[in-house]
């Protein structure tokens, strides 16, 4: 690769929870070649073979949503959910979704069995939602958001519980995604605590770097 002007190889292995069989051969090859870990993010994952009970706080939030009559459904209305998601990201983080609503709708149309939207609704109006990417082994929560109303009555907690206990109970893993920024040097402690309240525990997402 030196002949082509390449000076550095950056490799992000697929976390083991997405593999159907053990497949860490590339990691050993990188170690043997002298690669180093340049970044380490931390995700939160539920192992359905060793389910941990929900925390009391999460149970109270779910009970609040149940009392409010919140209902959970699979949905194809990406427009309404994207409005919620965009508002949340802009107001709380000053950012926007990686995908536009048109892009995510297109991806869903091409991979309808692997990309799905679930919403929590109050009087038939979505107030929380999760876009899930499915693999053979794992359900990955790619986008998660709730409106102010949804947050106040525990709609997102109810939706997450619905996905864990009913929709994806047959999957080996349910992955909430990472709670870190800046290559893993910043940990959002409130976010990871919320995920752990549903019984999730840590899985690292590493990045390897090899000088050529």
Residue ranges of model-derived segments:
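Short, basic/hydrophobic alpha-helical segments
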Residues: 1-6, 166-167
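Structural alpha-beta junctions
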Residues: 3, 32-38, 198-203
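Divalent metal-dependent hydrolysis catalytic cores, especially in the metallo-beta-lactamase
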Residues: 6-14
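Residue-level detector of family-conserved "landmark" positions at structurally sensitive sites
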Residues: 11, 40, 75, 176-177, ...
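A conserved beta-strand-loop-helix scaffold within acyl/acetyltransferase catalytic domains
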Residues: 13-150
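Aromatic (often tryptophan-rich) hydrophobic motifs at membrane interfaces
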Residues: 114-212
């Amino acid at each position: 690769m030196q002949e082509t002007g390449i000076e550095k190889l950056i490799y992000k292995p697929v976390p083991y929870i997405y593999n159907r069989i053990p497949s860490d051969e590339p990691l050993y090859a990188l170690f043997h070649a002298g690669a180093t870990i340049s970044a380490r993010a931390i995700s939160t994952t539920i192992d359905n073979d060793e389910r941990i009970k929900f925390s009391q706080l999460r149970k109270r939030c779910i009970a609040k949503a149940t009392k409010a009559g919140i209902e959970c459904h699979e949905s194809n209305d990406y427009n309404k959910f994207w409005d919620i998601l965009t508002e949340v990201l802009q107001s709380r983080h000053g950012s926007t979704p990686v995908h536009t609503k048109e892009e995510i709708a297109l991806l869903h149309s091409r991979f309808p069995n692997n990309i799905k939207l679930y919403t929590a609704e109050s009087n038939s109006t979505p107030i929380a939602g999760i876009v899930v990417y499915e693999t053979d082994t794992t359900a990955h929560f790619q986008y998660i958001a709730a409106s102010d109303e949804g947050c106040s009555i525990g709609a997102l907690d109810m939706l997450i519980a619905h996905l864990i206990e009913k929709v994806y109970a047959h999957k080996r893993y349910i992955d909430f995604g990472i709670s870190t920024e800046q290559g893993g040097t910043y940990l959002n402690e409130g976010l990871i605590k919320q995920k752990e309240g549903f019984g999730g525990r840590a899985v690292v997402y590493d990045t390897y770097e090899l000088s050529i």
